[in-house]
Amino acid sequence: MPSNQTPLGALPARFRRQRLLIVGCGDVGQRVARLVPAPLRVMALTSSPENCAVLRAQGILPLQGNLDNAQSLRRLAGLATRMVHLAPPPTEGWSDPRTLALLRSLDRRAWPRSWVYGSTSGVYGDCHGAWVHESQPVTPFTPRAYRRVDAEKRLRWHGKGTGVRQGVRASILRIPGIYALDRYGGTPQERLRKGTP
């Protein structure tokens, strides 16, 4: 077996521990980390040096890196056995180069065995208030939704891969709305009560 595909059993005991990498460890990522069972080691990719102390205080190992700087992602290859990707795509364009950079960095070594990507229900487009189900075809309406569809397609393609990518379970969550409790303007319920957008 090539050295870049070393199974967990061939590693020293301290490296055999299951490891979860959260990419985009803001409010939701930190909530996910609090729900992770104890034997799993939680790491988080952060581009903010100021955020490192906050993450450490919660028992999360911070890793400095930036999805807009592919060179800073090189060390992520082979690091995690599981991954949760919650980082948003860039605010402009029709594709998601951040997810592409992350996927390319992981191609260098053994991939996480499972991966969860936080997408958006916006990939369904304007459904005019109708119910949406996950088997419904995507019909992105905005550039933001197109960027999310691009990331989903890339993740699915990589999940069906061979070699270091073989056997990766990729799950996509199409989240209808995420609102931190301390978000400017309040929660959706508070904004409805106030009559503000």
Task: Kindly label every feature range from the protein language model.
Residues 1-76, 85-86:
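Hydrophobic, well-ordered beta-alpha structural blocks that scaffold small-molecule cofactor pockets
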Residues 57-65, 101, 130-134, 161:
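Active-site regions of enzymes building and remodeling cell-envelope glycoconjugates
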Residues 70, 91-93, 124:
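Short glycine-rich, flexible loops that bind phosphorylated cofactors or substrates
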Residues 76-116, 150, 154:
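NAD(P)-cofactor binding segment of oxidoreductase domains
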Residues 86, 115-121, 173-175:
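SDR active-site strand-loop-helix element
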Residues 101-143:
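Conserved Rossmann-fold NAD(P)-dependent oxidoreductase catalytic core, especially the SDR/UDP-sugar
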Residues 128-172:
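Catalytic helix-loop patch of NAD(P)-dependent Rossmann-fold dehydrogenases
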Residues 166-197:
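NAD(P)-dependent short-chain dehydrogenase/reductase
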